[in-house]
Amino acid sequence: KTMERYEAFVEYLARKVGRDPVCLRRPTYAETNELVRYGRCEVALVCVCPFLRGERDFGMQALAVPQIRDAVTTHSVVVAPRSSEATSLLDLRGKRFASADIVSYSGWIVPALWLREQKEDPDGFFGEHILAGSHDRSVQAVLMGHADGAGVLSLVYDQMAAEDPTILERTKTVFKSEAFGVPPVVVHPALDGKLKEQLRAALVGMHKDPEGAKVLAALGIQRFVVPEATLFDSARALAKRWEAR
């Protein structure tokens, strides 16, 4: 269902810039970055950490960011079954933990760094680290009893709960981070300048177009905006602390 919505997003964007739509999905964040780095795709949606790494490694640029509930920031949250005795991330010691990817900023790096700053070793803290492949699959792992906790992007968790309110009855939040910039739509810095501006214009104008507004509504997005240069500063600072280990 999620992929169908993003396919509709890709199809809309492609029509706006006169291109054939091809929706590529890779199993890891690193592989998605490689698509952008080597020009195998024109535009991509990436997690915060892959964006920061792409920015550092080859100048990846944030073209636009989604605005959701009047905000362009989000959080990392760790969710657990409602029936769990856990009330904090520390209570998940020795338990099964799910995240989208090993380089997922909200799914792994933020909670893992918090554990390290509590003098814990995140690599040995959990009994099992499950790489679910996406945030919604991480939440599903908790719902299905395959994981005792999951680190996820709060935007995804909130959207899932909005569509299925029973999720809030079956899960609870045991950790919530400080706010950081929402994952962006990115391009390679060497992408043709005219195409880059066409893509940006299509994104920031989507909410004004009835067809575009329908696509956005299905994704739980109000509109796309051009990000301020400082939007990802807090994430950059946290990533530096993580990489300084």
Describe the residue ranges of each PLM region.
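An extracytoplasmic/periplasmic, membrane-proximal ligand-sensing/linker region
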Residues: 1-8, 180-182, 186-245
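Extracytoplasmic small-molecule ligand-binding "clamshell" domains
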Residues: 1-52
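Ligand-binding cleft/hinge of the Venus flytrap
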Residues: 7-19, 107-131, 159-166, 237-242
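Short helix-initiation/N-cap motifs at beta->coil->alpha
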Residues: 23-34, 122-140, 179-181
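Short helices/loops that flank or line small-molecule/ion binding pockets
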Residues: 30-44, 57-58, 90, 134-155
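A ligand-binding cleft/hinge motif common to bilobed small-molecule-binding domains
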Residues: 48-57, 111-117, 141-144, 148-168
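Short beta-strand->loop
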Residues: 60-71, 125-128, 161-179
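Flexible hinge/capping segments at coil-to-helix
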Residues: 80-101, 122-124
